[in-house]
């Protein structure tokens, strides 16, 4: 069986997990409420502030799904209790960002400003014009939003200009010599 799938998910105080028909799991916490439908190859059981996931049979797919379901459930529990954040840095002359409500205005060297509409459940802060902090309870959605923003102007390998994750390393190339 999957090593990750064997580990139980500890449920902190203030977080409740409801398992409905069809493996629809709803996690409620102080920050948000998340729900997801999981594969029917796994079974969820919640008792004494601990959730366990077991595969319905010993097929390779069911065992793999148990590990995946455990990791996703763990992220949901952490998201509704603590939340997640992702930081982006903008590098380049004249490149900047400004958060306005549920929109993010990006000036990235195009002839027009790029306006990115944030999905529900994700908030953005811009403590500096070249720094974006994205926060949310859903780790998957947060990563998707950060990836979409980065996609507008990926870091280029010669000068490093563009939007990058805070912990991202951009390998620099040497310019062509005559």
UniProtKB/Swiss-Prot annotation:
Biological process, per Gene Ontology: cytoplasmic translation
InterPro entries: Ribosomal_uL6-like, Ribosomal_uL6-like_a/b-dom_sf, Ribosomal_uL6_a/b-dom, Ribosomal_uL6_bac-type, Ribosomal_uL6_CS
SUPFAM superfamilies xref list: Ribosomal protein L6
GO molecular function: rRNA binding; structural constituent of ribosome
Domain of life assignment: Bacteria
Cysteine disulfide links: none
Record-level GO cellular component terms: cytosolic large ribosomal subunit
Signal peptide: none
Annotated coiled-coil segments of the chain: none
Keywords (A to Z) from UniProt: Ribonucleoprotein, Ribosomal protein, RNA-binding, rRNA-binding
Entry keyword annotation includes Chaperone: no
Entry-linked Pfam families: Ribosomal_L6 (PF00347)
Keyword Ribonucleoprotein set for record: yes
Function according to Swiss-Prot or TrEMBL: This protein binds to the 23S rRNA, and is important in its secondary structure. It is located near the subunit interface in the base of the L7/L12 stalk, and near the tRNA binding site of the peptidyltransferase center.
Subunit annotation: Part of the 50S ribosomal subunit.
Family: Belongs to the universal ribosomal protein uL6 family.
Protein name as it appears in the record: Large ribosomal subunit protein uL6
Organism: Francisella tularensis subsp. tularensis (strain SCHU S4 / Schu 4)
Record gene name: rplF
């Amino acid at each position: 069986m999957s090593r990750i799938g064997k580990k139980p998910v500890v449920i902190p105080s203030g977080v409740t997990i409801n398992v409905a028909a069809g493996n629809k799991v709803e996690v409620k916490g102080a920050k948000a409420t998340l729900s997801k439908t999981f594969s029917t190859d796994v079974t969820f059981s919640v008792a004494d502030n601990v959730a366990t996931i077991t595969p319905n049979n010993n097929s390779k797919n069911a065992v793999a799904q148990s590990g995946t379901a455990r990791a996703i459930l763990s992220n949901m529990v952490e998201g509704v209790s603590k939340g997640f954040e992702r930081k982006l840095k903008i590098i380049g002359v004249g490149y900047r960002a400004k958060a306005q409500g549920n929109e993010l205005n990006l000036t990235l060297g195009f002839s027009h400003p790029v306006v990115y509409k944030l999905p529900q459940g994700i908030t953005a802060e811009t403590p500096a014009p070249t720094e974006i902090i994205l926060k949310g309870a859903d780790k998957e959605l947060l990563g998707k939003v950060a990836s979409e923003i980065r996609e507008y102007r990926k870091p280029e390998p010669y000068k490093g200009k563009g939007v990058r994750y805070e912990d991202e390393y951009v390998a620099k190339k040497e310019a062509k010599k005559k």
